[in-house]
Amino acid sequence: MAVNIYDTANQMEQEIRQTSEYKSLQEAFAEVRKDEHASALYSKFQDVQSNLQQKQMNGEELTEEEIKNVHEIADQIEKVDLIKDLMDKERNMNQLFSDVSQIIVKPIQELYKN
């Protein structure tokens, strides 16, 4: 029997959309987007996070200004319940992906274990 792993992956993509984790994330994201302040702050947070990740990948050190900026944004985010809720839903989604990833890589882990 031939297995088309891409069909399985496409089915998984559709099933992810039906999970409570995805639906909760989708709702939380919509709520953040509806709130102008929360949306702008979350976008700023994403930009800063992306820039920091890029610097880390390039092996660059963070400047004092960048560290200060990260702390300021984190403090602001802590005061916005919509963003805190969204980030909680993101953590739940990431946990789902982590669990699924462990299942997917199990054959490789077993291969190298023996």
Swiss-Prot record:
Cited Pfam families: Com_YlbF
UniProt cross-references to InterPro entries, sorted A to Z: Com_YlbF, YheA/YmcA-like_dom_sf
Highest taxon of source: Bacteria
Transmembrane regions: none
HAMAP family: UPF0342 (MF_01526)
Family as reported in the entry's similarity comment: Belongs to the UPF0342 family.
Protein name: UPF0342 protein PEPE_0673
Organism expressing this protein natively: Pediococcus pentosaceus (strain ATCC 25745 / CCUG 21536 / LMG 10740 / 183-1w)
